[in-house]
Amino acid sequence: RKVPHFEFIDQNRDTITEDTYKGKVFLVEFFFTRCPTICIPMNKNLVHIQNTFKDNPNFGIASFSIDPEHDTPEVLKEYTQSYGITDPDWHLMTGAREEIYELANVGFNLLAQENPNIEGNFQHSGLFALVDQNGFIRSRKDDFGNPLIYYRGFIPQGAPEVEGEETSQIDILMEDINKLLNKNKK
């Protein structure tokens, strides 16, 4: 599945579209800066991934805020500083709520919605999508041959995951990023 068109403003007030990532392998997440739960390990995992691939100009991260009324470019900029987000190809984006929710729920098939009944008042997926250099969402097969389309980003690095799994989803994700980055080097 191809990444749909998007156009939002990032933490530097730059306009970012899917073409910003053209020719790059990149990750997609939906988050919000006031998230009291899964965003914390998700973004710590992404910082770990950022630091692993920091010298590769063909890698990027696209983070879309599901709380755009609060998450202005200034708030997103402060968030980058507090989390150690330094990669110029990691864009934290904000824009029209309806467009962001449409991108999440329809474009990437990842949950994003308001929910006043839970802590933080927003509900969203803790999964990352991996996109290849041609703009296609990529997947791999699990041990049973089923497609693994998304990667669990909400498990803290090094923490036990699902019983019986030997390799963390973040390690698998980094392996898949490496495969895509090295695909054209052969």
Language-model-detected regions and their locations in the chain:
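N-terminal "domain-start" segment that seeds a small globular fold
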Residues: 1-19, 44
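Structural microenvironment flanking redox-active thiols in thiol-disulfide oxidoreductases
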Residues: 43-103
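Structural micro-motif
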Residues: 90, 101, 108-113, 123-129
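Short loop/turn microsegments at loop-to-beta-strand junctions
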Residues: 3-4, 26, 125-127
